[in-house]
Amino acid sequence: MSDKPKRPLSAYMLWLNSARESIKRENPGIKVTEVAKRGGELWRAMKDKSEWEAKAAKAKDDYDRAVKEFEANGGSSAANGGGAKKRAKPAKKVAKKSKKEESDEDDDDESE
């Protein structure tokens, strides 16, 4: 299961990975969250995203090919239960009985 190909990065993420250092250089001491925020602003303002969209499309094609190969070699698919695992729900807590209820039950036991 660990050999399953990872999903490809979006055009934005590909661009952000390449632009991250220059954003940090322009804004020394900037927080990671602020880098992402500034990156989002720059990405929205960018006019020509075709270079990054083409890279993302190629990455998606490579991913689709790798997934087909993975499944052809016996890898599990989502239909076979290979989807995301759900967390186990915590066990429900049993309500504690009040002292009065406990003494009432004790009385019932004694009468039998």
Curated annotation (Swiss-Prot):
DNA-binding region boundaries: 5-71
Keywords: Chromosome, DNA-binding, Nucleus, Phosphoprotein
Modified residues (Phosphotyrosine): Y12
Database matches in SMART domains: HMG
Listed GO biological process terms: chromatin organization; regulation of transcription by RNA polymerase II
GO MF terms held by the record: DNA binding; DNA binding, bending; minor groove of adenine-thymine-rich DNA binding
UniProt GO cellular component terms: chromatin; nucleus
Name listed for the protein in its UniProt record: High mobility group protein D
The organism of origin for this protein: Drosophila melanogaster
